[in-house]
């Protein structure tokens, strides 16, 4: 009997583990446990917010175990999957110390890191640039405690190898066997479902399944935190213009707009002058029934249902590229 534990940061990041869980539970010889773990926001004075912890919001077919009901030390699982390795190195976020990688490493034979965030494909030719962003990918805990890493693409695998091994043939051989990209869950889940089987709220069907024959083109529009912080009112103006265009083309197109969930909090803290305009934009979209406002925890449904992507360069765009469907970056005219 092999014991396998999945440590989930939240229901919103479960799609970053789901297909690995599917594979593990398919073997009756495996004892599989899913444990949501407490997370905290780190304030500017280095104090921590109250813990964020929930057992709800996960798929109905996934049994959830309370963090206090399972001892990693006593059970010593064969494999632990974690979505976080920045034990103390993230200035804005952390997990409970019991789930830092050094503690996890002492409780398992194999600690596997599955990064949730997707990043744009990065050219490996610009070494100074690669060195300048190294801290976004590599931290001491990763080097010391992680046995295996699952990344989104071969490009990211090569990036990790550059950071971890440099040009050392021995280290390249050592790390190559520890980094995989053909089983990255956020890519694999896009193959697991199709338009008919992927979850979507009932209210989406009003627009997605009209009382007419023929398929209307479904366009996914994503707005990122960085996009709005960088381009500010240009984003508001461009989106308003785009919404008006879609209002005039509802017979042929359906728009799914997915603003990144943290946008409101980000502009409140960093661009307070945009808050009212952003709220008005949301109201305009909803009041005029422009399209679907995607507030689901994961972008998986919108990616699978839609025919085309337009919007910001972000993790959703990178996932969309893996589908082979058309992708366009939205130009804010700045």
For the regions a language model picked out, list residue spans one by one:
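Short glycine-rich, flexible loops that bind phosphorylated cofactors or substrates
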Residues: 88-90, 158, 227-229, 317-318
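Nucleotide-activated donor-binding/catalytic signature segment of Leloir-type glycosyltransferases, i.e.
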Residues: 271-295
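Conserved catalytic-core segment of nucleotide-activated headgroup transferases in glycan assembly
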Residues: 16-20, 184-279
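Short, surface-exposed amphipathic charged segments that create phosphate/polyanion-binding patches used
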Residues: 49, 77-84, 188, 192-204, ...
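Nucleotide-activated donor-dependent transferases that construct or modify glycoconjugates
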Residues: 1-11, 220-224
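A generic structural motif
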Residues: 27-33, 250-255, 291
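A donor-sugar binding/catalytic signature common to diverse glycosyltransferases
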Residues: 294-334
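Active-site and donor-binding regions of nucleotide-sugar-utilizing enzymes
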Residues: 5-189
């Amino acid at each position: 009997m092999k014991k396998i534990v999945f440590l989930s940061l939240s229901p919103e990041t479960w799609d970053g583990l789901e297909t690995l869980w599917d594979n593990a539970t398919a073997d009756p010889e495996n004892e599989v446990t899913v444990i949501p773990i407490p997370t905290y926001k780190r304030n500017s004075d280095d104090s921590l917010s109250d813990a964020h912890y929930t057992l709800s919001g996960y798929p109905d077919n996934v049994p959830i175990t309370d963090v206090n009901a399972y001892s990693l030390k006593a059970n010593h699982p064969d494999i632990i999957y974690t979505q976080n390795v920045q034990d103390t190195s993230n200035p804005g976020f952390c997990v409970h110390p019991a789930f830092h990688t050094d503690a996890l490493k002492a409780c398992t034979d194999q600690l596997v890191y599955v990064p949730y965030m997707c990043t744009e494909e990065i050219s490996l030719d610009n070494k100074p640039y690669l060195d300048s962003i190294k801290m976004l990918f590599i931290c001491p805990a990763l080097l010391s405690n992680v046995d295996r890493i699952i990344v989104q693409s071969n490009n990211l695998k090569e990036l990790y190898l550059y950071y971890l091994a440099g040009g050392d043939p021995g280290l390249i051989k050592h790390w190559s066997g520890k980094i995989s990209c053909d089983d990255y869950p956020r890519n694999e889940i896009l193959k697991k479902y199709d338009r008919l089987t992927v979850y979507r709220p009932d209210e989406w069907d009003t627009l997605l399944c009209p009382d007419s024959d023929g398929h209307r083109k479904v366009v996914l529009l994503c707005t990122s935190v960085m996009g709005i912080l960088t381009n500010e009112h240009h984003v508001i103006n461009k989106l308003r213009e785009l919404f008006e265009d879609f209002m005039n083309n509802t017979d042929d197109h359906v728009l799914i707009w997915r603003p990144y969930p943290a946008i409101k909090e980000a502009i409140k803290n960093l661009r307070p002058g945009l808050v009212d305009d952003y709220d008005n934009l949301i109201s305009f979209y909803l009041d005029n029934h422009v399209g679907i406002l995607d507030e689901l925890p994961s972008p998986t449904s919108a990616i699978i249902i839609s025919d085309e992507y337009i919007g910001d360069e972000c993790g959703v765009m990178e996932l969309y590229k893996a589908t082979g469907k058309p992708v366009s970056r939205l130009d804010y005219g700045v």
